[in-house]
Each structure stands twice: as structure tokens, then as C-alpha cells.
Amino acid sequence: MKTLYSLRRFYHVETLFNGTLALAGRDQETTGFAWWAGNARLINLSGKLLGAHVAHAGLIVFWAGAMNLFEVAHFVPEKPMYEQGLILLPHLATLGWGVGPGGEVIDTFPYFVSGVLHLISSAVLGFGGIYHALLGPETLEESFPFFGYVWKDRNKMTTILGIHLILLGLGAFLLVFKALYFGGVYDTWAPGGGDVRKITNLTLSPSIIFGYLLKSPFGGEGWIVSVDDLEDIIGGHVWLGSICILGGIWHILTKPFAWARRALVWSGEAYLSYSLGALSVFGFIACCFVWFNNTAYPSEFYGPTGPEASQAQAFTFLVRDQRLGANVGSAQGPTGLGKYLMRSPTGEVIFGGETMRFWDLRAPWLEPLRGPNGLDLSRLKKDIQPWQERRSAEYMTHAPLGSLNSVGGVATEINAVNYVSPRSWLATSHFVLGFFFFVGHLWHAGRARAAAAGFEKGIDRDFEPVLSMTPLN
């Protein structure tokens, strides 16, 4: 395909360190990018870029399969998943595979199957990636026009966007079908401490589903992260899947409007920046979800949330001291507030002491003890079940506060287990990756806008120090 603009003008700041490492058609002379600039060399080689993306997908799926089998091989059924540093098996368990009442693992075979399926898929993707990177056509426009594209062809780009949206919508519906028809999913709120169940009564009311989007993101409200029943989660996926599929069909059938053609930058690097920006938002949302939400991420598999561990500690000591004869309704703490129970600013009865700041926690082991005005004193005296005591004692000693070089758990809890919670791993990694992707979004957006405006300068290549240095080889 003929290059429609000057490489010198657009691709200006790359220096070749070692000319012998480049392949024909992918060297600095023909692309303006050196080998270490990676896929930038393939901007105008749609066939080779396809190979790079398929191979990348193969690496991702290979990691999923290999890590899945690694976790299965190391899994000890007697210990909770969160004590074993697992991050993939909890996701499979949440989808209802291999678990029974209370989140107990009763069968690891589905986990093995998942790992093997991903390994086999990765082999297919790996072969396709190598084929398209080395053997397939360099460009797809001539032989396979449906799969070919020019980056500034606005109509083709929105068609590709539409196809992606439809695939995302189908992905959302996979979860819906699993929850409705294929065995159900794990519900941490099922009576008696959680169980796998089919979701029958979906929440489809737009006022409820979109009400989450209108909530404040701060404490007590918690935006979409505050979702706490599976009917809403699965109903939300019905809405999201439908919107994605309908939006995909819309983008395939229509051309961009004039305002969009004017407002957006239409180049490969611009699309990269848009994608990185979206992934950054996903990363930050996932961080908050796995840290605070114990419905989408059940504590049976991921360990308690921070607020949950704190409230569990207060509950455990209330149970202990009540057995020893304390009147938990009236006992006074060192500050003059209630030692075990007090009132929140809005009048609910809540746990006293330091855990008062987590008074809006909702957890399946605690909710049965609440009445219309918060914690119910008569229920606390008569209705506490052994499973609630066991679970809160377990969560009290497994706060998600450990770090790689510290002792895990709450500093004031002498029985804390020294471990790093999967919530810590997943929240931290997604926050850090979200931040890096945001920086990448800014970087590529800046470059794309500069190239579109035609004012980027780069460095004067004629008098660059590296030109007078001896080659690396």
C-alpha cells in the first residue's frame, strides 16, 4: 500500500541502534521506526499487525491457562483460597464452578478443564500469530478487503468499532446465560452462608440499574461499586450487553456524523490513545470493585474487605464478652461512647469503637442481625448463629492489610494471619496498571494531536551525538 504521508514528518524521534537486526519491510528506512519501537513498525502493514495482535492474545490466554493449572496444582482444599495467594480460582468459584454451600470447594476438576481449554486455545492463537507475523500477507487490503483498513478511513473504523462492541455485548450475555441457565453463580447472600444458585428474578428496571450510575462515588453511596445483590449484577449485564450489541449494529450501519469527523483525530495512534484511556478507567473501577465489593467478589474466595475485617473484630469481641456476662447494650468504652454498640450520625445502632468508621458495611454474616434501626439488640442477644461466629472470627484474623515485607492483618489483632490478601494484590495491581495506562493515554493522545496538527518537530538528526558513536555490533 502506498504511504500517503511523509515518514520523515510523522515519525521523527526514533533512532536505530543496530541496523542489522531489522527485517525487510520492517526496518527504520522503510517505516521510520527502529526494531525496539515494536508494533509501530507495522502501522501500515495490516497483515503483520494482525499477527502481532493474535500472538499477543495467545500470550494472554497462555498465561491464563498456565497460571490456572499452577493454582490447581498448588491448591489445598482445607485452606481458604485467599490464604493461598490464588487470583484465578476465586474467579472460577464465583462463577459457580466446583463449589457448594458456604463456598466450600467440592470438585477441582472444572478448574483443571478451564486451564487445559485455555492452553489449547493459546496454541491455536500462537500458531495464528506466528503464521500472520511471518508467512501471511503483509497487507490485507488487496486479498481480504473485509479485513483490510486504512487508519483514516472513518467509515471503516466505526465498522470495526461496531464489531468490537457486538463481541463485548456477547461476552456480557455469556455471564447472563451462565447465571440463568448453566448452573447459576455463587451467591454470597444465600441463606446460611452462601451457595450456588440460578438467578431467576432479574432486575431489569432502568431506574434501579441506571440509578447506580447517578449515585455519589463516596462513602455510603459508592456509585456502581455499591451493588449488593446478584439480581442487579446480572440484570446490569443484560442492559450492558444489549446496549453494546445495539450500539455495535448502529456503528456498523452508520457513518460518523460531521461533528465527530471534526472533533476526533482519525489515526492509528489516536485510536491507541482512546483505547488506553478506556482501559485506564476500567482499571480504576476494577480496583475499587475488588477492594470494597463483597458480592461480585465474595469474601469466601477473596477474603474479607478491610471494613468487613474490622467489623468482624468488633462482632467477635461482642460475642465473647456477652458470653462472659457483659451487657453489650449499655457498656461504656474508654471515650464515653458505647464500648460495643453506639449510634451512627443518622441514628442507626452500629458497632462501637474504632470500627465505627465502617458502620455502613454490609456483609452476609452480619445482615441477619439488623433490624429497621440498625443492629437489633434482641437479635444480638438471642439469634447469633455458630456459622456467623466462625466466619467473623476467620475474617477478623484475615484483614487485607498485609504487604510483601510486613506482617499481615490488623496491627491491634494478635491472632492475625500473616498473608497478603488477593484483594490487596488485585486492587493494587489494577490501580497501578490503570495509572500507567492513563499516562500512556496522555502520551499517545499528545503525539496523535501533534501529528494531526502538523507541528511536531522531533530532534535534528544531522548533529545527534549517537551518530558519531561506534555501532553496538
UniProtKB/Swiss-Prot annotation:
Pfam family, one: PSII
One GO molecular-function entry: electron transporter, transferring electrons within the cyclic electron transport pathway of photosynthesis activity
SUPFAM superfamilies in UniProt: Photosystem II antenna protein-like (SSF161077)
Residues of the propeptide: 1-14
Residues the entry annotates as binding [CaMn4O5] cluster: 367
Transmembrane stretches, start-end: 69-93, 134-155, 178-200, 255-275, 291-312, 447-471
GO biological process: photosynthetic electron transport in photosystem II
Residues the record lists as Phosphothreonine modifications: 15
Protein's membrane topology: Multi-pass membrane protein
Domain of life where this protein originates: Eukaryota
Family to which this protein belongs: Belongs to the PsbB/PsbC family. PsbC subfamily.
Function: One of the components of the core complex of photosystem II (PSII). It binds chlorophyll and helps catalyze the primary light-induced photochemical processes of PSII. PSII is a light-driven water:plastoquinone oxidoreductase, using light energy to abstract electrons from H(2)O, generating O(2) and a proton gradient subsequently used for ATP formation.
HAMAP family xref list: PSII_PsbC_CP43
UniProt name for this protein: Photosystem II CP43 reaction center protein
